[in-house]
Curated annotation (Swiss-Prot):
UniProt xrefs under Pfam families: Pribosyltran
Species for this entry: Methanococcus maripaludis (strain C6 / ATCC BAA-1332)
Coiled coil: none
Highest taxon of the lineage: Archaea
Family that this chain belongs to: Belongs to the purine/pyrimidine phosphoribosyltransferase family. GfcR subfamily.
Biological processes annotated in GO: pyrimidine nucleobase biosynthetic process; regulation of gene expression; UMP biosynthetic process
Family annotation (InterPro entries): GfcR-like, PRibTrfase_dom, PRTase-like
Protein name: Transcriptional regulator GfcR
Keywords: DNA-binding, Transcription, Transcription regulation
Covalent S-S links between cysteines: none
Length: 205
């Protein structure tokens, strides 16, 4: 496992970030983030991932050179706008936090209503049961056709949660992500579109 990734996870943990936020920041699954924060020091000492965990694979995606630049993000958003040319919709929902910058740029480019969905993994509460929520401009999407935007889809849990929530107040038509790690094409009848998709190929000698 990449040493740099382990060090980043431990640094975020020490800064007080919960596993969900670490996963979001590093574009890894929540399970991987939890594993790194609990076992990071031992992994660094060992110099490699323990053998018993060698079959548990996750893919680390880093696109800081893109998301750190508003110009580059706008270029990505224009690609998504082109993919949206045959979709009729009224509003855009960005999944917090990674999908918000892109959703903002797309809504500006297409002059569409904009809203934010905050998944439950970002809701810090002591309650055992919690849900995500629409964090901005909810009234603009109620009863409307909407598309959902996120940067990276790892397990699909946040997207599935967002779709389920929005189906109670609106009509989600499609999901657009920059990078898909899940291999999922559809969730609850809603099509998932991606710019890039990753996968693991098992090559046996």
């Amino acid at each position: 496992m990449k040493k740099e990734l382990i060090l980043k996870a431990l640094k975020l943990r020490d800064m007080g970030f919960p596993s969900g936020d670490i996963a979001e920041e590093l574009n890894i699954s929540v399970k991987t983030a939890l594993y790194l924060t609990l076992n990071g020091e031992e992994l660094l000492k060992a110099g490699e991932t323990p053998k018993e965990d060698s079959e548990k694979l996750d893919i680390f995606l880093e696109w800081d050179n893109v998301r750190a630049s508003s110009r580059r993000l706008r270029n990505i958003s224009k690609i998504i706008c082109d993919m949206l040319s045959d979709v009729e919709f009224d509003g855009i929902v960005g999944i917090s936090s990674g999908g918000v910058p892109l959703a903002t740029l797309i809504s500006d480019e297409l002059d569409k209503n904009f809203s934010i969905y905050v998944p439950k993994k970002h809701v810090h509460t002591e309650k055992e049961k919690t849900t995500g929520f629409i964090g901005q401009n909810m009234s603009s999407i109620v009863g409307k056709d909407v598309i959902i935007v996120d940067d990276v889809m790892t397990s699909g849990n946040s997207v599935k949660e967002t779709i389920k929530y929005l189906k109670g107040i609106a009509n989600p038509k499609k999901v657009f992500v920059v990078m898909d790690k899940s291999g999922i094409d559809e969730i609850d009848g809603v099509r998932i579109e991606h710019l890039f998709r990753t996968g693991v190929v098992d090559i046996k000698k």
